[in-house]
């Protein structure tokens, strides 16, 4: 199941994800909060959020819904000491609203195809 993260304290509820990925998400949330406000209405205000996609079903739902027809502005590889690398892909839905999809490197191949 996808996890939508837009506040740093939500990271306390995230399990089974490498610490390097958590830190990357924390940095992204920090930038969004600094520029758009920590208490923004995530659905109505500008800014955006991070989505953690944990399986192929999550990826397919994203591609058919919010990310339909979009290609990422960029994708960064998050190198993890535990062996499985993750990626962070920035999708701009408008000039002031972004979704950053964080997923394993293997699943990102489906996200980017």
Model regions and ranges:
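Short, extreme N-terminal segment that most often corresponds to the first beta-strand
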Residues: 1-22, 103-106
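Acidic, low-complexity, intrinsically disordered interaction modules
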Residues: 36-107
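Short acidic DE-rich linear segments
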Residues: 111-113
């Amino acid at each position: 199941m996808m996890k939508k993260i837009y506040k740093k304290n939500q990271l306390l509820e995230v399990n089974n994800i490498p610490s390097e990925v958590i830190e990357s998400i924390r940095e992204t949330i920090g930038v969004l909060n600094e520029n758009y406000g920590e208490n923004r209405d995530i659905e109505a205000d500008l800014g955006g959020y991070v989505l953690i996609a944990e399986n192929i079903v999550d990826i397919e739902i994203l591609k058919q819904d919010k990310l339909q027809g979009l290609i990422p502005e960029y994708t960064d590889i998050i190198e993890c000491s535990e062996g499985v690398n993750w990626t962070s892909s920035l999708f701009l839905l408008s000039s002031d609203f972004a979704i950053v999809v964080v997923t394993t490197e293997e699943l990102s191949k489906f996200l980017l195809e």
